Amino acid sequence: MLFLISPAKSLDYEHPAPVPDAGVPHFSAAAGELIGLLRQHDERGIAELMDLSEPLAALNVARYAAFSPRPTSANSKPALFAFDGDVYGGLGAHELSRPQVRWVQEHVAILSGLYGVLRPLDRLQPYRLEMGTRLANPLGKDLYAFWRTRIAEHLNERLAGQRAPVVVNLASEEYFKAVDRSELRARVVHCVFQDWKGGAYKIISFHAKRARGLMVRYAALHRARSPRALAGFDLEGYAFDASASEPDRMVFRRRLP
């Protein structure tokens, strides 16, 4: 079973990672191609392409200029500890034991606009490139054209050898669209997180993002081996609702006080 999660815009390069080992991203060469395309844009061009403020555009132009084809401990950090958004707050990697981090390394894939797909301990250099960015490239008009077949093929490689391969999708729609479902040789199970608000259960973005990370945390703590094991998810008040679920769409709900 392989869990898919999205990256985060926020990055943390101030605090050291608690694990020394890190790997090189599988699609490093392809990421280098995209960096080459991004370097063709000045600050104004990046601001327009990504709808960024001038300071953020300047920051990322500097990041692209500094990007190295050889990630090291000095210019990078394991992705699991570098990403710092809501999903990663829920996952709480810094609180996991070494064996639990190793479990995450083997059972989680992080989708990325720049790197395509990452293992959690792959060396991540600072960047910003969302999957929905319309960056023209030799394969098409956007990053979906650039990545789609490659990502699915890589996920198939990671799932090779499993008798009944399952992908648990915890990524956003923007990122999961980069996976070519026609090429993916696995059952896909979607997890949906809803909170009670205004007299109905609704997906509330902040809570849902955090819950996706909590689900990865739960799976690591319990070494989950099948979707059935995820039905016991109970972190921060969520509970599986069988009546609202379908075989490949697991719904978790909660009512906050």
Swiss-Prot record:
A Pfam family of this chain: H2O2_YaaD
GO biological process: response to hydroperoxide
Cross-referenced InterPro entries: YaaA
GO cellular component, one term: cytosol
Transmembrane segments: none
Superkingdom field: Bacteria
Residue pairs linked by disulfide bridges in the UniProt entry: none
Protein family membership: Belongs to the UPF0246 family.
PANTHER family with a match to the protein in the record: PEROXIDE STRESS RESISTANCE PROTEIN YAAA, PEROXIDE STRESS RESPONSE PROTEIN YAAA
Protein name (database record): UPF0246 protein Mpe_A2092
Organism of derivation: Methylibium petroleiphilum (strain ATCC BAA-1232 / LMG 22953 / PM1)
